[in-house]
């Protein structure tokens, strides 16, 4: 099957087409080309677009017809997860080891399954330095055992990836971040594409048009000023 895609013009690389112009097959593919500069990535996320491509492919930009999202105030951990956390030695932090979280999200996946290639790692670490990319870490004593990272776009957190090296670590990262995000006036967590794991955690499907409308409203509204300061989000001893 031949696919004809528009290509980002280098001199206008932060200008994306309307996401309603994305293809139906493959679902959500919008445009190719450009680069992973900070300006281009921030513009993409502000418009509900994200990069996703394989090694050797051009950069492909997506906005699927159905989005996976969390409304953090609705996130409800199971009784078993709460009990597990209370009995564990886990502690949860925010922005204490973002570079490490990005590296582990990439390295803990089979090579053929990861889209987090060296150029993407470099690009998102640059966004860390600029204050746009943030992480949640889960520790067992001093060992980093799970976490997630993503971008802040106003009152929206655009989740990129998560990893878990020990039982329930990524679930606890998401739970504690939802609690913190709500208290900081955060409204929406974008998961990009729905999958069974996210659905099992309570993610909901949202049509692209509805997501676009909500994103346009929320991306210009701020969270509280201390939302992304490096801090502890909770430990099993005081959960």
UniProtKB/Swiss-Prot annotation:
Pfam families: Leu_Phe_trans (PF03588). The keyword Acyltransferase applies. It is found in: Cytoplasm. InterPro entries: Acyl_CoA_acyltransferase, Leu/Phe-tRNA_Trfase, Leu/Phe-tRNA_Trfase_C, Leu/Phe-tRNA_Trfase_N. GO terms for molecular function: leucyl-tRNA--protein transferase activity. Belongs to the L/F-transferase family. Functions in the N-end rule pathway of protein degradation where it conjugates Leu, Phe and, less efficiently, Met from aminoacyl-tRNAs to the N-termini of proteins containing an N-terminal arginine or lysine. This is Leucyl/phenylalanyl-tRNA--protein transferase. It comes from Aliivibrio fischeri (strain MJ11) (Vibrio fischeri).
């Amino acid at each position: 099957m031949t696919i004809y895609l528009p290509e980002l013009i280098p001199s206008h690389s932060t200008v994306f087409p309307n996401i309603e112009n994305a293809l139906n097959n493959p679902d959500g593919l919008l445009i190719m080309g450009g680069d992973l500069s900070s300006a281009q990535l921030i513009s993409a996320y502000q418009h509900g677009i994200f990069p996703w491509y394989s090694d050797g492919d051009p950069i492909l930009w997506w906005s699927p017809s159905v989005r996976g999202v969390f409304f953090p105030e609705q996130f409800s951990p199971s009784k078993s997860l709460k009990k597990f956390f209370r009995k564990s030695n886990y502690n949860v932090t925010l922005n204490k080891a973002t570079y490490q979280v990005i590296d582990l999200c990439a390295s803990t996946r089979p090579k053929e399954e990861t889209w987090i290639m060296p150029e993407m790692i470099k690009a998102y670490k640059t966004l860390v330095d600029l204050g746009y990319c943030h992480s949640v870490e889960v520790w067992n004593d001093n060992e980093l055992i799970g976490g997630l990272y993503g971008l802040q776009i106003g009152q929206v957190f655009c989740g990129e990836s998560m990893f878990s090296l020990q039982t329930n670590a990524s679930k606890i990262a998401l739970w504690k971040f939802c609690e913190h995000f709500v208290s900081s006036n955060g409204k929406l967590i974008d998961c990009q594409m729905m999958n069974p794991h996210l659905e099992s955690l309570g993610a909901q499907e949202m049509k692209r048009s509805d997501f676009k409308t909500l994103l346009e409203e929320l991306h210009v509204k701020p969270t509280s000023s201390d939302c992304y300061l490096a801090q502890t989000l909770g430990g099993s001893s005081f959960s």
